[in-house]
Amino acid sequence: MQVRMLGRVDLRETVEAMQAFTAQRTGDTPDVLWVCEHAPHFTQGLAGHADHLLAPGDIPVVATNRGGQVTFHGPGQVVAYPLVDLRRAGYYVKEYVHRVEEAAIRTLAHFGVTGHRVAGAPGIYVRLDDPRSHALLPQRPRKADPLEPAAAVPDFTGLGKIAALGIKVSRHCTYHGVALNVDMDLEPFSRINPCGYAGLPTVDLSTIGVHTTWDEAASVLASQLAIRLAP
């Protein structure tokens, strides 16, 4: 997999470039990983609801065709876009998601942090009371949503989200990807229901005591994705 470190790039232009790359690629087009960061933007996925944008203020909102709901991108966040031909790679979408999440978990482990999955809520989470604990996270049952009694939501008690995942698959090829919070202004997350979950805490490496550079975190995540997404 080719890795391209793009630095700070325009979000809308990057989304358009991913779409164009995917539309034009052939069976011989090499897979590529774009790693970048963006100026402050909220992005809405296909499952997004306007009421999850509580008070966007002066931060632009961009509608996208990725899966998932609303999230925030900004400086100090590593955004990785794997452009992978799944048919050639030999695995399906569910396995692809697992591999991307595993790359984020291994990246956190590099910095001494234990990342966790939560059933029914894509992305990676950390324990707020002890981010370095290796104890397994019990998979708790979903709890009732008082606003939607017929629905149920994952139990995020004691957890904070540190990496968000949102993908699109077209003609067996992936785009969009994963965002890892490194050292960023987290205030904009209070203006939304992150990924559609009211009150879900969002953290970055800095707030849980890990001080590193964007470049180092980007390098580790890129390396892990290249390893995990290999055929």
Curated annotation (Swiss-Prot):
Q: What is its subcellular localisation? A: Cytoplasm
Q: Which domain of life is it from?
A: Bacteria
Q: Does the keyword RNA-binding apply?
A: no
Keywords from the named record? Acyltransferase, Cytoplasm, Transferase
Q: Where is the BPL/LPL catalytic domain?
A: 27-231
Annotated residues for binding of substrate: 66-73, 164-166, 177-179
Q: Which Gene3D superfamilies match?
A: Bira Bifunctional Protein, Domain 2
Major site of localization recorded for this protein: cytoplasm
Entry's family note? Belongs to the LipB family.
- Other remarks on this protein: In the reaction, the free carboxyl group of octanoic acid is attached via an amide linkage to the epsilon-amino group of a specific lysine residue of lipoyl domains of lipoate-dependent enzymes.
Q: What is this protein called?
A: Octanoyltransferase
Gene name of the encoded protein:
lipB
